[in-house]
C-alpha cells in the first residue's frame, strides 16, 4: 500500500496535501480586510487584522469581506480591481498627455492659419475691414448644421416639396442636437460648434492612440498615429464645426471597447448607436463590429449577445421614421443627398470616369477641378488600404473601409472622399507601423502632407470648395 500510495500521489498531485496544511489550517477562515467572521476569527480594524496578518492581495483595506462560512466574497475582491482598471482608462497617463500636447499644438497652428486667412483673403480684396473672427469657420456644411439646430428640419411647414429647398434632411441629427444642447450654455453658435469639435477631437486622438497601442507594441505607436492624423491633408475638418471629430470621438472608443471587453458589452453598442446618429458611416462601423464579433466569440453564451449588435441600427431607423412622418418617404435623407450632391447610384467605373472628366477635361472651374483630382487620389489610397487590410486578414477593418469606399464610389462623381480619409483610422495605424520600421518615412510624410494640409485649410477657411 505505501508504494501504491506514492504512485497515486505522483499521478494526482492534488491528492498530496501541502506541507503544513493540517486540519487546523484548512479549517481556518480567510483573513480579509472586511468585516470579522462570527466563527472566532480575529477582528479586522481598518487596514489589517489586529493579530498582524496582512489583508488578501496585499493591499490594506480593499480585499473583500469574509463570510460566516469562512469564504471570501469574490465580488468585493473584484470591485477594487475594476475601479483601478477604469481609473487607468479614464485618467490620462504620460503617453496620453503627450498626445494631448500634440493635439493642442496643432490646434494652435490651425487657428493661426485661420487668423492669417481672415486678413489675407477677404471677400473684397480692396476692403480695409477684416471679417469677423469666426467668419472663416462658417463655411459650407456648417450652414446646414446651424439651420437644423436653430430652426429644425422642417421650419414653418417647409420641406423638399418647395422650390429652393436646401436638402438639410441629408444630414443626420446627431451633430445638430449636440450643437443645440451646447448652445444653451454657449450663446454664440459658431463658438459652440468649434467647442464641440475641439473637445471631440481631444477624445478622438486619445482613443486613436490607445487603439494603435493595441495593434503595435512600440510605445511611440499611439503618438505617431495621432501625428499622421492631425497633419493629414484634410485635418482642418477636425477643427471646424463639422461631424468628423464628433464621429471619431464615438466610433474609436466603441472600437476600443469592443476589443477590450468581453462579449456582451453595452458600452460599444451604445457608442456605436450614437455614432450612427452623427453620420451614416456609423452603419459601416456596426458592420465591422459584427465581423469582429463573429471572429472573436468562442462560447454559446457569448453568441447570445448577437442581438445587441442590432441596437445601433435603431438610430438611422428612428431618423427615417421621423422623416417619413413629415415627407412620407422612408429614404428622404438618401433622396436629399441625390438631389443636392448627385449621390444617385452609378457603377464604380462610371463614377471614376465622371470624376476624371471633372478633374482634367476643363469642364469645371480650376478650384473644383483640383479637388476632383484630390478625390481620385483619395480613392486610390482607399483601395490600396482595403487591399493591405485584406492581405493582413484584418477583416473587420477591411469591411469598414470597403463599405465606405462603396458608398462614396458609386455616386455620379466622387464627393468628400478626402474628408472621409479622416475616418479611416486603420490608415493612420498602418502608417504609424511603417514609420516605426522605417524612420525616414515620418520625415517624408510630414514634408509632403504638411503643405497640403495648409492648402486645404486656406481653401476651406477662405470659403472655397475643399471637398
Where are these regions (language model features)?
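Membrane-interface alpha helices of multi-pass inner-membrane proteins
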Residues: 230, 237, 251-258, 265-293, ...
